[in-house]
Design a protein with these regions (language model features):
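Alpha-helical segment proximal to the catalytic Tyr-Lys
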Residues: 124, 168-172
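Substrate-binding pocket helix/loop in short-chain dehydrogenase/reductase
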Residues: 95-96, 103-108, 197, 201
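Short, small/polar-rich loop/turn modules that mediate ligand/substrate recognition or access, typified
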Residues: 171, 176, 230-232
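Residue(s) in the substrate-gating loop at a strand-loop-helix junction
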Residues: 139
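Conserved glycine-rich cofactor-binding loop
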Residues: 11-12
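Active-site helix of classical SDR
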Residues: 119, 155
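C-terminal substrate-recognition "lid" of short-chain dehydrogenase/reductases
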Residues: 131, 209-237
Length: 242
């Protein structure tokens, strides 16, 4: 029976590349986004054309009841989630003192609250099955912090701490929890950079360029395939930048 992989925030960018990478292996794929329904359906068509079965679920994974409905659909069609990839995330650029509380809540709820929600529903079956993989997409800003991205940095620091703590809790049940701390990746999240700003950033990165979404997807798949002894790790993927 094929394993089931859930990737949140997967209509574009890193999540999209991860979904396509797992689809190559003919896994059951569950893709999700908050409102880009058309993009999600296009991705579903690509995945099914590759021979993989797919559920496309449009909904806000920062909402607990929405995630509950998503897992009901998954359970009906595929059964339990074997691989949970928590990729949904948002950022906001600006001074901390100008950040409104509603925007703080939105960033925290999306970037860390969604992980609570999805883990809450995925973990019981993983424990029952004595196997499972949870991979959280984090950021180097969760390690060192970024000026003018305080809320995002705080949320990703929480992702890293959750990853390490949950890995210890679930290791006795043969469930591995790891995170990828991404550096500058060439996705829409960084599209606000001007050409001059992007060039200056590339000069700061020892590798001389931003990473690609496909490279992140390749690393995520390698983590999934890695020995079960690899758990609780925050793996930097930043071209030697930080």
């Amino acid at each position: 029976m094929s394993k089931t992989v859930l990737i949140t925030g997967s209509s574009r960018g890193i999540g999209r590349s991860i979904a396509l990478r797992f689809a190559k292996e003919k896994y059951n794929i569950v893709i999700n986004c908050v409102n880009n329904h058309d993009l999600l359906e296009q991705l579903k068509d690509e995945i099914t054309a590759m021979g993989a079965d797919c559920i496309a679920f449009t909904g806000d994974v920062s909402n607990y009841d929405t995630v509950s409905r998503m897992f009901d659909i998954i359970k009906y069609k595929f059964g339990s989630v074997d691989v949970l990839i928590n990729n949904a995330g948002i950022s906001q650029i600006g001074l901390f003192q100008d950040l409104e509380r509603k925007d703080w809540n939105r960033i925290i709820d999306t970037n860390i609250g969604s992980i609570y929600n999805c883990c809450h529903f995925a973990i019981p079956d993983m424990i029952k099955n004595k196997q499972g993989k949870i991979i959280n997409i984090s950021s180097v800003w969760g390690i060192c912090g970024a000026s003018c991205e305080v809320a995002y940095s705080a949320s990703k620091g929480a992702v890293n701490a959750l990853t390490q703590a949950l890995a210890k809790e679930l290791a006795p049940s043969s469930i591995q929890v790891n995170a990828v701390a991404c550096g500058a990746i060439d996705t829409q999240m960084n599209s606000f950079l001007s050409k001059d700003e992007a060039d200056a950033l590339n000069e700061e990165i020892p590798a001389g360029r931003m990473g690609s979404a496909d490279e992140v997807a390749s690393l995520v798949f390698q983590i999934y395939k890695s020995p079960d002894y690899l758990t609780g790790q925050i793996i930097r993927f930043d071209g030697g930048w930080i």
